[in-house]
A protein has these predicted regions:
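Flexible, membrane-associating and regulatory peripheral segments of lipid-active enzymes
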Residues: 1-125
């Protein structure tokens, strides 16, 4: 099986020093609307995909060019995935706080490796 990429947006608290759990169990201290964006790559597995890499887009404050913000970089990478790959369609999976952030991403990876639309795989964006 090929590797699986999952995009994400989250309002969880960012823990940049914690390599095992980059986002915690609480809301971002800056408020529920303070979002961070990124992507995670998994080694595909039909039962439990394995997280290989996690990239958090930089949180660029006071940047007038939206494409240079974390949200802008996220949207551009997702647009490219939809425009130039077999994954033309995208599903947004909203996951709550009842599991870890990594657990939510892993659930998204399971969906990304199994869902198809018109015989083609789909992109998955996890919001947790």
């Amino acid at each position: 099986m090929a590797d699986v990429r999952v995009f994400f947006a989250t309002n969880r608290n960012h823990q940049p020093g914690n390599k095992k759990q980059v986002f915690g169990k609480t809301i971002n201290p800056d408020g529920v609307a303070a979002l961070r964006f990124g992507r995670a790559d998994f080694t595909a597995d039909p039962v439990k995909p394995v997280l290989k890499t996690l990239h958090v887009y930089p949180d660029v404050l006071n940047e007038p060019d939206v494409l240079k913000t974390g949200g802008g970089m996220f949207m551009e990478d997702l647009r490219k995935a939809m425009a130039f790959g077999p994954r033309c369609d995208t599903m947004v999976f909203v996951h709550g706080f009842n599991v870890s952030f990594t657990g939510a991403l892993q659930a998204g990876a399971l969906m990304a490796q199994s869902l198809k639309v018109g015989g083609h795989p789909v992109n998955v964006v996890v919001f947790s």
